[in-house]
Curated annotation (Swiss-Prot):
Subunit structure: Part of the 50S ribosomal subunit.
Name the UniProt record assigns to this protein: Large ribosomal subunit protein uL1
Gene3D superfamilies hit by this protein: 3.30.190.20, 3.40.50.790
GO BP field: regulation of translation; translation
Top-level taxonomic group: Bacteria
Keyword DNA repair: no
UniProt entry tagged with the keyword Repressor: yes
Chain's role: Binds directly to 23S rRNA. The L1 stalk is quite mobile in the ribosome, and is involved in E site tRNA release. Protein L1 is also a translational repressor protein, it controls the translation of the L11 operon by binding to its mRNA.
Amino acid sequence: MAKQGKRIRAVNEGIDRVKLYPLDEALALLKERTTAKFDETIEVALNLGVDPRHADQMVRGVCNLPNGSGRTVRVAVFARGAKADEAKAAGADIVGAEDLLETIQGGTIEFDRCIATPDLMPLVGRLGKVLGPRGLMPNPKVGTVTMDVKGAVAAAKGGAVEFRVEKAGIIHGGIGKASFPADKLAENIRAFVDAVVKAKPAGAKGTYLQRVAVSSTMGPGIKVEPATVHTA
């Protein structure tokens, strides 16, 4: 525990908890402090001026990160016939219909993204209580209910990141790995923020993008000046 406390003090040293850092400086500080033995995930957190308890202030969407996420994404596809073949050819890890339903109902969920053709949504709907809480339920708003199975699988594998506002008006997104060059991380963050801003709901009032912070898996959170991330 003493060794862990020393490491935490070391990564926090030199960071002003009140200051809003320009994005490039924040990323430099963060990368200097990624000392774990694995490739840490870099995450951005956005505080939005919305109350998601109101339907007209819900924020949800998807962002195709220009430099990928660095993650190996396992994709499951509900499809039959030619669309099932298309999914397999596109690189989907699991493809099925009733058989996939039974596998999931049996408690085996070995995927990170779930895609379905529209005709199979009545079947997939039976998994709402299982997939919904895990953020895996296919949804046309984020392109995971579609006949373009090939495109959806490619997007998921290539770094598409779904986002959804939480109760406190916060959105989190993993936007890359500590091994990424800082400029690539910055491009991903700006693309992610742009996607969230474009998803601004009609019911949002006042300042929409209120606070921005970046962090790593084992590192500190660093506050970022919003104007260096997105220009309104």
